[in-house]
């Protein structure tokens, strides 16, 4: 997108005007999928809280992306944009059981991040497929304000509560199909991310009917010239190898999920 293009668009549509570069979004999406091309099953859930413009959602849908939603309003917007319920993940924080029930009734995958709701939902709906969000207590984001995997974070069930979590799952006989984590935004050190991934793998070993592992996102993009960014290619190389190795140990090809938001869209806006 060149300055002259922006001037022409402003003259055509008037100003102020929001312009998004579809080619940039597409190149970022392809960069991520290429980095993990050695993984048999890869799914991208666009974190729509980054930019929920319906035209952007439709663009990503046509590329093959799915969605990560944090509220029932985002779920409804995703459905409006043409996504099917099975293409949407619901990852709320601090919402009521009633809202989770309402979203689940739509056929959307539920991701639960606290023990109280997990027990209540599992008791009422033991056969409904559920993903569990854990907190690995690893701070991989740029600072504590945008890191959500550290010990004081409100996001996710602490790994120190794993025995309690397992008791709930055993007592309710609920159907756990996925394990999820999200360490934070602006990840610089991929070794820290890989360390958190090992914690996720260890937790996953406790569940025998998993279908996917969700590693969140938080990939840093450059905000200015020569700014540092997450080395997606190196992360793809290392995590793909370890993920494939884990699947072999687990005895099943699981789906690897990422939920990028600003990685896909933050460099595309004008």
Regions found by a protein language model. Name each.
Residues 108-120, 151-163, 185-198, 230, ...:
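Active-site glycine- and acidic-residue-rich loops that bind
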Residues 70-73, 91-94, 127-145, 177-181, ...:
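Non-cysteine beta-strand/loop elements that form the S-adenosyl-L-methionine
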Residues 1-109, 115-128, 152, 167, ...:
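A charged N-terminal "starter" segment
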Residues 57, 80, 100-102, 122-125, ...:
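Short acidic, glycine/serine/threonine-rich loops at helix termini
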Residues 48-52, 73-74, 94-96, 114-116, ...:
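Active-site-proximal loop/turn and secondary-structure-junction residues that shape catalytic pockets
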Residues 6-13, 178-182, 216-223:
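A short small-residue
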Residues 132-159, 166:
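Phosphate/diphosphate-binding glycine-rich loops and adjacent basic-rich segments that engage nucleotide
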Residues 188-270:
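C-terminal active-site-proximal or functional interface alpha/beta core segments in diverse enzymes
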């Amino acid at each position: 997108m060149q300055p002259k293009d922006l001037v022409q668009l402003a003259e055509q549509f008037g100003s102020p005007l929001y312009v998004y570069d579809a080619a940039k979004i597409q190149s970022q999406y392809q960069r991520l999928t290429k980095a993990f091309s050695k993984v048999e099953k890869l799914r991208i859930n666009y974190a729509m809280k980054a930019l929920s413009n319906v035209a952007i959602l439709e663009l990503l849908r046509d590329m093959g992306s799915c969605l990560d939603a944090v509220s029932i309003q985002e779920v409804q917007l995703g459905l409006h944009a043409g996504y099917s319920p099975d293409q949407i993940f619901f990852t709320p924080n601090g919402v009521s059981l009633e809202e989770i029930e309402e979203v689940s009734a739509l056929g959307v995958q539920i991701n639960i991040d606290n023990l109280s709701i997990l027990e209540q939902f599992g008791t009422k709906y033991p056969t409904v497929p559920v993903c569990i969000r854990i907190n690995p207590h690893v701070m991989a984001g740029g600072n504590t304000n945008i890191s959500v995997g550290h010990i004081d974070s409100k996001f996710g069930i602490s790994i120190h509560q794993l025995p309690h979590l397992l008791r709930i799952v055993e007592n309710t006989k609920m159907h756990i199909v996925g394990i999820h984590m999200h360490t934070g935004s602006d990840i610089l050190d991929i070794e820290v991310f890989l360390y958190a991934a090992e914690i996720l793998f260890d937790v996953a070993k406790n569940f025998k009917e998993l279908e996917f592992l969700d590693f969140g996102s938080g990939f840093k993009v450059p905000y200015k010239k020569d700014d540092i960014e997450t080395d997606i290619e190196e992360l793809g190389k290392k995590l793909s190898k370890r993920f494939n190795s884990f699947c072999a140990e687990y005895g099943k090809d699981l789906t690897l999920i990422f939920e990028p938001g600003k990685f896909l869209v933050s460099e595309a806006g004008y």
